[in-house]
Each structure stands twice: as C-alpha cells, then as structure tokens.
C-alpha cells in the first residue's frame, strides 16, 4: 500500500462506522480495515442486495445490513464515514453529531492517505467532462506518473488514493454532497466549472448549496490554485473570499491571463491554442469545459500541441451528449447525465433545432420548466416521459413545438422518435430531470436508451 498512513488519526484501535455500503463505502471500509481500524459497516438494504457485504465479512469487518439500529452507534466510535447521498438529517448522522463524533465523506479519507497532489473539480454542470478532459491532457504530456480519475466520476477516491504513487496526480470529481463532509481536504489545484441552483431537495436553500461547493477551497493557501468561471458574477465575487491564487477562464471575452475563447478560437495567456471547431465535442458548454481543463494543463506545463491533439480526439464521455450511432440517416445522442434544466439547455445549444427530436423527463422535484422554454423554441418534436412528462409537455406547447408525444420511459421513446424524424435529423435524450422515478441512476437510464437504439440496427 502506498497511502500516507502517518497522516491518518483514526486507524489502530479506533472504532469507525461506515454508513452506506455503496462503492465509496465499500472502498472506505476496506482501507480503514487495512489501516488497523475496528470497522463497522451499516446499510439499510438487506445482505442479499449487497454482494460487497460478504467480502467485507471475510476480512473481519462487522457488517449490519437491513436496518439502521440506532443503538449501534455509541461514544466509543471515533469517526463516521458517510455515503455522500445520505442526508445530514438521517438519525444516525444526527446522533453522531450529538455524540461529538466527526462525520466525513470518503474523499476526506482519500486525502488523508494520498501521497500525490489532488486536483479537485466541482460545479453544477460539466464536472465529469472537465475531469475527464483534465486527466486526458495531463496524460498527454511528458509528466512523471499518471493522472488518475477519482471521486464522483465513478472511481472511489480512497481506492485510487491507495494505489497512487507520489509521482501521480489524482483528478477528483467532487459533488456538493461529498464536499459537505470534508475537514482538512486541500487540493493543490481546484476548479469550479459553474454554480447554478441545484439539489435544493438535499441542501434546502441555494445559499447552503453554494456554501457546500465553496468548501472545496476552504483549506487552500496562496501556494494553491483556484480556477474559476469568470463568466459568472457570483464566482467573481466569491474569488475575493479565498486565500488561493485565482486563475480565471471565460468564453467570448479576452483575458490578459488565463484561458479564454474569442472569435472562434481558444487562447491561454493570449496565445492561441486551437480553433473551437477543432474540439472533438460540440456545444458552447464544452468550450467552457475545455477552458477549465486547459487551465489545469498549463499549470503543469503541457504544450499547446499536446493539448490541441488530445482535445481534437476527445469525443465525450458516456451519458454526456454521447454519440450512440446512426440508423436510417438519424443520429442518436445520449445525454442522460443532464439531470437539470441548465444541462439540457447547454446540450441543445450544440444542435440544429429544426432537425432535432428531444426526449426529456424524469423525477419531479417541483422545478419550473419556464426557463427551458426559450431553448425549446424551434425544436422539431418533443417526447416526454416520467413524472414530469405533463409539465414538460406544457412547456413544449408554450415554446410552440409542433409535435409533442409521450412515452412510458426513455427506451420506449426511441421508436416514437424514429417515426417523428427523417433522414438528416438528430435524436437527443437529454432529460432535464433526475432518473430516480424510473431508474436507479442516470447511467442505467442512458444504457437502456442506448440498448433501444442498438436494437433498431439489429432489427433492420
């Protein structure tokens, strides 16, 4: 193991409760056990739904599944590692706080054992693409070691931190849920792609959501770098409240320093790197993502040529305006990661709307779709599904969309979209909603959509 064990204070002879046995909980429990902690894992789902439980039991880790017995938690525990999705209103979390037990998320644990620099990336939208681009650019240079992706992107941070060497860099996608549970976490480089209203059902207010995002920089010093979207006034104001060295990036404006785009080209410190048309992914939002990633790459001395070549050959990540395939002259795109209105608006900006059939819908969080209406104007057809299908249909009517249909789910919308389209059109799944009304997560939603598209080619 390559982790920096001497930094970790909750290991030998210490009792630790891991709450939630998802990917991050499983990895955290294994790491803590290896560090010598007395680990107890608790998950509300029964054993037969948690195959990881058997592996932990074989290691000697205590696992309690199927319920949350409140008497399990007492003052003998020195730490709780909480799954990011579990709210702070959970009885276990509240009891831990009452007992004075620190409550962290797995990314804090990863920081404690990591021997290499961490690049932390957060924001409402663009986190995954920016994280992927950043890792790609860092690995395109001649740097020692490897840039390793971790965090909310799907690779448990504690596992990656264990495996990383001192020459590596960990590029970590961080959600607001994860950032609420940090104490000493300090990235050497941090990126905030943007901040818009989101996850109010979890954070209760926009102020609390922004506060969680801003935790990213709370331990940074002038020796660290904070890369911010200068198009957002809110981030420009927040930049005055950090000790880190601030590096801006912006679209459609000239910056004396930093990454920017202007008149169809991308620049860094006023030196042209590439034309926007040379990017391998479409859309103005992906220009922003590229600028953020370039900002990190230039800090590490990556050449303009390496950046240009890597971004030209990067065609996106799964479920983010992902090209699925073509059938009967129609191109299909999977943007299942678009779990909010802004993400769908950004996706729409990359398409010719009069040749686009949009598939949207999902979990009803009570959001108004009025702000989506301007972006819907000009679309050829709209297919809605899920809990929000009726309200999205109303928004489509207000936008003047000539053809609006409903479907049972995302995959059922595929043959309907085929009927409503013609050769040369694009069909885009960009739900503008979370997936949990019909699917376990946005990845499964996207996979079901892609399976339905692939069936078309088999049946032809």
Curated annotation (Swiss-Prot):
Catalytic activity: UDP-N-acetyl-alpha-D-muramoyl-L-alanine + D-glutamate + ATP = UDP-N-acetyl-alpha-D-muramoyl-L-alanyl-D-glutamate + ADP + phosphate + H(+)
Pathway noted in the entry: Cell wall biogenesis; peptidoglycan biosynthesis
EC number: 6.3.2.9
Xref: SUPFAM superfamilies: MurCD N-terminal domain, MurD-like peptide ligases, catalytic domain, MurD-like peptide ligases, peptide-binding domain
One biological process term in Gene Ontology: peptidoglycan biosynthetic process
Family the entry assigns: Belongs to the MurCDEF family.
Origin: domain of life: Bacteria
Protein name per its UniProtKB record: UDP-N-acetylmuramoylalanine--D-glutamate ligase
Purpose of the protein: Cell wall formation. Catalyzes the addition of glutamate to the nucleotide precursor UDP-N-acetylmuramoyl-L-alanine (UMA).
GO-annotated cellular components: cytoplasm
Classification via Gene3D superfamilies: Mur ligase, C-terminal domain, Mur-like, catalytic domain, NAD(P)-binding Rossmann-like Domain
Keywords (A to Z) from UniProt: ATP-binding, Cell cycle, Cell division, Cell shape, Cell wall biogenesis/degradation, Cytoplasm, Ligase, Nucleotide-binding, Peptidoglycan synthesis
Location in the cell: Cytoplasm
HAMAP family: MurD
An example molecular function term from Gene Ontology annotations: UDP-N-acetylmuramoylalanine-D-glutamate ligase activity
EC supergroup of this enzyme: ligase
NCBIfam families: murD
Keyword ATP-binding: yes
Principal place of residence: cytoplasm
Sequence positions that bind ATP: 123-129
